A protein has these predicted regions:
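Boundary-proximal intrinsically disordered activation/regulatory segments immediately upstream
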Residues: 16, 28-94, 184
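Active-site/ligand-binding-proximal alpha/beta "capping" segment
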Residues: 231-284
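Structured adenosyl-cofactor binding patch, chiefly the S-adenosyl-L-methionine
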Residues: 131, 171-173, 187-201, 266-303
């Protein structure tokens, strides 16, 4: 929040935005702040805070995440997410970042030359603009599952690239919602948001349970109680092919995908209603979880 003196709280830190804003027509515009000191504490949100610090588990109402590129930031704004501060190369203010800047209103806009921002962030801002945004209130998985027919469940998927790719495939290929066990990577991790291309703001998602001990039991029981049959994606001798007609005919199906490398736990596989395999050729024994998810989502989508 910004008070009358222009101070802004970002992830628990207090930042100064100059106490004034510019106006373009009747619209209030961000106060442009030239970066001359890379150690300014208000820049920590963009470069020095860890993902855990941004998330702020102890005070989730103060949590922040970073969105990159005009496309991704625009999707977040479309979904109602609150912008807190912008960081962009000076030349983009009237270029690729102009539309986003106009939408964000009176928030701090930090800017500098490419070399300055590269030293600050550790990489070039090839996507033009970063936006620090307020994390939303966590949703209950029951709320997310209301009225759905197909949901994806990620078990202990810790790689941010995979989480982002799975969410993107889910949004594109007919999945209604994504659920994550408590040990999964945060979907609002910077890389996960980037890889998802903003689809994390378009498809509902939630954690199923608050503690790792709540999965697979009672987590799977909760899904069954909501009317879902559960399908564990795993290569087992007793598995059914992903093309099984009975599987596709299920009115409500939860597609359960396991962590990188080891896949689903034996207990999860045993407790699911189905064990499902993707037939392979040329001696290939498995697919990356993100690739497997895309195949499963398309084949098992509600018809």
């Amino acid at each position: 929040m910004k008070n009358e003196k222009g101070w802004l709280s970002l992830g628990g830190k207090t930042c100064y935005n100059g106490g004034r804003e510019q106006e373009r027509g009747n619209a209030k515009m961000p106060q442009i702040i030239e970066i001359t000191d890379l150690s300014r504490p208000e820049l920590d949100v963009f470069c020095r805070l860890t993902e855990a610090q941004l998330r702020n588990r102890l005070e989730p109402e103060k949590g922040v995440f970073i969105a990159e590129s005009p496309t991704v930031i625009g999707l977040a704004l479309d979904a109602g997410y609150e912008p807190l501060a912008l960081l962009t190369e000076r030349k983009f203010i009237e270029g690729k970042a102009a539309g986003i800047i106009a939408r964000c209103g009176e928030i701090p806009l930090y800017t500098g030359e490419r070399e300055v921002l590269a030293r600050l962030t550790g990489y070039e801002l090839t996507r033009g603009v970063l936006c620090a945004m307020r994390r939303p209130r966590p949703k209950d998985f029951r709320e997310v599952c209301a009225g759905t027919r197909r949901v994806a469940v990620l078990e202990n998927v810790v790689d941010s690239t995979n989480v982002g790719a799975i969410i993107r495939s889910a949004a594109a290929l007919g999945i209604d919602a994504v659920l994550l066990t408590p040990s999964c990577c945060d979907p609002l991790n910077r890389r996960a948001v980037r890889v998802s291309m903003g689809t994390v703001f378009q498809i509902p998602w939630a954690y199923i349970g608050e503690q790792p001990a709540e999965w697979p039991s009672p987590g799977l029981d909760w899904l069954n109680g909501l009317g879902f049959k559960t399908a564990a994606m795993a290569l087992r001798e007793d598995s059914v092919s992903i093309g099984d007609e009975g599987l596709a005919a299920e009115p409500k199906l939860a597609i359960v995908l396991g962590t990188e490398g080891t896949g689903l736990t034996a207990r999860t596989i045993a407790d699911c209603d189905y064990t499902v395999r993707i037939p392979m050729q040329h001696g290939v024994d498995s697919l990356n979880v993100a690739a497997a998810s895309a195949v499963a989502f398309w084949q098992l989508r509600a018809k």
